[in-house]
């Protein structure tokens, strides 16, 4: 092996040790390009490190999106905005700046099924992941079951601390299934712990006056609504269902 190739292999070996993925995979071609174009040492080093940083940023975005556990990837750019309910159209521009995360505010998207609530929530979540925030998506029924299991296993405090690492938690489908007092109390505690510290997005098919049907406790219902809506964005997503319109169109 020539001295040149030995040097390339040593560069790659060092890059692997330092977890420099781009340098490890592209050292040879980058060095060849620098020699061919008579690139200065400082320009070569700057170019190489910039590409390493770009790769890490991109990998970080993909990793955060994967860890968020979205059921599918829906982007804000895919929304047919003129078909959203009026309140959703009016407030989306403010929400997509993600200032609500910086300000530790919540979002409640309330309206009948099929109007874009979950799409907006996931779209905001993916954008947050791409901007460096830690996000978790979970349906409310699954969340309550997880909380109840942790209580049975005496690990609730550990689970609450784990939830605290997330800048944004999306709690989808509140209202589709009611739960008992224990489940309501556990969910209330989680929401209270995040209040004014981290952001939460709730999607629900029920207006606030019907939330007692979920929690079966008027005092707890009032307390949860108070925690969620304090300094929050409440979006009225009542309107014609996207899915119903698509189904009717297919039947024509």
What are these regions, as identified by a protein language model?
Residues 16-71:
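Interdomain "pre-motor" coupling segment immediately N-terminal to P-loop NTPase/helicase cores
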Residues 74-98:
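N-terminal pre-Walker A segment at the start of P-loop NTPase domains
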Residues 102-107:
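Pre-Walker A (Motif I) flank of P-loop NTPase domains
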Residues 109-111:
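Hydrophobic anchor at the beta1->P-loop junction of P-loop NTPases
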Residues 114:
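Walker A (P-loop) phosphate-binding loop of P-loop NTPases
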Residues 117:
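Conserved lysine of the Walker
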Residues 120, 124:
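Hydrophobic positions on the alpha1 helix immediately C-terminal to the Walker A/P-loop
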């Amino acid at each position: 092996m020539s001295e040149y190739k030995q040097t390339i292999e040593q560069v790659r070996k060092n890059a692997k040790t330092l977890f420099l993925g781009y340098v490890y995979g592209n050292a040879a071609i980058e060095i060849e390009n620098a020699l061919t174009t008579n690139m200065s040492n400082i320009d070569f080093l700057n170019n190489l490190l910039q590409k390493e940083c770009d790769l890490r940023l991109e990998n970080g975005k993909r990793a955060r999106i994967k860890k968020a556990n979205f059921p599918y990837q829906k982007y804000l750019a895919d929304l047919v905005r003129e078909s959203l309910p009026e309140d959703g159209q009016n407030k989306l521009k403010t929400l997509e700046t993600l200032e609500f995360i910086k300000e530790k505010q919540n979002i409640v998207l309330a309206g009948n099924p099929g109007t874009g609530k979950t799409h907006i929530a996931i779209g905001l979540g993916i954008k947050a992941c791409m901007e460096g925030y830690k996000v978790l998506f979970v349906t409310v029924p699954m969340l309550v079951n997880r909380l109840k299991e942790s209580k049975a296993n005496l690990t609730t405090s550990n689970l609450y601390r784990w939830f605290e690492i997330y800048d944004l938690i999306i709690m989808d489908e509140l209202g589709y299934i009611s739960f008992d007092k224990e489940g309501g109390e556990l969910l209330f505690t989680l929401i209270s712990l995040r209040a004014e510290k981290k952001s939460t997005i709730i999607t629900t098919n029920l207006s606030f006056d019907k939330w007692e049907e979920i929690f079966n406790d008027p005092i707890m219902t009032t307390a949860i609504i108070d925690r969620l809506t304090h300094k929050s964005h409440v979006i009225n997503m009542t309107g014609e269902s996207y899915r119903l319109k698509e189904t009717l169109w297919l039947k024509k």
